[in-house]
């Protein structure tokens, strides 16, 4: 799969994990996967892994399934196909989440964009109050168009409050 694509002599997942390990604030970086081949590659490159089941609808369910095993209050989900993720970007996200007075359950960073036809990127639709209403690769459903403030591009990193992630997993399985 895509995570094992060779980039300059190393699989994409290794590049992504090594970039995450450069973060000042992440104590541990784990690759959560159901693939024995990915686990083998990660172990060879000194990257911690957690073996998961195969039957998940999305990456959030996969991360949520292992959240109880991780002794942290905040869990950062970095998609495995982000080999150019900037460690400073991860650090900024962690700082925002830990310093926020209301301690949000989830922070999904995005980039403002004006594209609407590209189905390869995840769109983030925000309400007029700034709350996320919709995340999807699909085009914006017509019924939402009058209620949205902007369409943004999701940047493949999400910060979760661990308790919220565990609750999500319990209610969506």
Show the residue positions of the predicted features:
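Nucleotide phosphate-binding site architecture
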Residues: 5, 39, 166
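Conserved core of the sugar-phosphate nucleotidyltransferase
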Residues: 85-172
């Amino acid at each position: 799969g895509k995570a094992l694509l060779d980039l300059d002599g190393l699989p994409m997942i290794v590049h992504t994990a090594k970039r995450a390990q450069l973060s000042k604030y992440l104590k541990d970086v784990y690759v959560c996967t159901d693939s024995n081949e990915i686990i083998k590659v990660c172990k060879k490159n000194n990257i911690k892994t957690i073996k998961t089941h195969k039957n998940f609808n999305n990456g959030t369910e996969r991360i949520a399934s292992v959240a109880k095993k991780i002794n942290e209050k905040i869990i950062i989900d970095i998609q495995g196909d982000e080999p150019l993720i900037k460690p400073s970007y991860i650090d900024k996200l962690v700082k925002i989440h830990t310093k926020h007075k209301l301690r949000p359950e989830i922070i999904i960073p995005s980039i403002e964009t004006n594209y609407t036809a590209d189905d390869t990127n995840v769109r983030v639709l925000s309400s007029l109050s700034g709350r996320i209403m919709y995340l999807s690769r699909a085009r914006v459903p017509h019924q939402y168009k009058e209620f949205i403030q902007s369409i943004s591009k999701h940047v493949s990193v999400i910060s979760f409050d661990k308790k919220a992630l565990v609750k999500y997993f319990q209610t969506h399985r």
